[in-house]
Curated annotation (Swiss-Prot):
Protein name, as recorded: Caveolin-1
Organism field: Bos taurus
Residue numbers spanned by region Interacts with SPRY1, SPRY2, SPRY3 and SPRY4: 131-142, 167-178
Cytoplasmic side: 2-104, 126-178
Residue spans that sit within the membrane without traversing it, per the record: 105-125
Keywords, in A-Z order: Acetylation, Cell membrane, Golgi apparatus, Isopeptide bond, Lipoprotein, Membrane, Palmitate, Phosphoprotein, Ubl conjugation
Length: 178
């Protein structure tokens, strides 16, 4: 560490030698990551979003894909004028498109804020209230389950075993009379 220049395995030039074990907070992380084949962790808040495919998990495939043909249809023998049909199609499609954009512009960010708060509260309650309550219940119920198990093995098992032996010798013969 005399201030000399060093070259690492990838050819990068640096002044202070890098520890082979990794940084001081995670000793052996460099060697362990290669040995354990750990994946690189990405922060969910800094990931890029896809502006083309906005439903990558196909949440709304069957619900909101409503086109003109799904709502308005004229059966054979009952047709309006072609111009009216084309104008209706255009009016429906453009109105749906721009009204959705208007609603998204007005209410999209407030609704995202509300749903973000809601799911944050839900996650918080699940992590800090629900799971600890269930774990404590399971710990507390364990002593009751032991007492119940002793009761069943002491009283119920012999009783039902005796009843089973009583009814095990019953034989039924059926005869068919003509």
């Amino acid at each position: 560490m005399s201030g000399g220049k060093y070259v690492d395995s990838e050819g990068h030039l640096y002044t202070v030698p890098i520890r082979e074990q990794g940084n001081i907070y995670k000793p052996n992380n460099k060697a362990m990551a290669e040995e354990m084949n750990e994946k690189q962790v990405y922060d969910a808040h800094t990931k890029e979003i896809d502006l083309v495919n906005r439903d990558p998990k196909h949440l709304n495939d069957d619900v909101v894909k409503i086109d003109f043909e799904d709502v308005i249809a004229e059966p054979e023998g009952t047709h309006s004028f072609d111009g009216i049909w084309k104008a209706s199609f255009t009016t429906f499609t453009v109105t749906k498109y721009w009204f959705y954009r208007l609603l998204s512009a007005l209410f999209g960010i407030p609704m995202a804020l509300i749903w973000g708060i809601y799911f944050a509260i839900l996650s918080f309650l699940h992590i800090w209230a629900v799971v600890p309550c269930i774990k404590s219940f399971l710990i507390e119920i364990q002593c009751i389950s032991r007492v119940y198990s002793i009761y069943v093995h002491t009283f119920c098992d012999p009783l039902f075993e005796a009843i089973g032996k009583i009814f095990s010798n019953i034989r039924i013969n059926t005869q068919k009379e003509i």
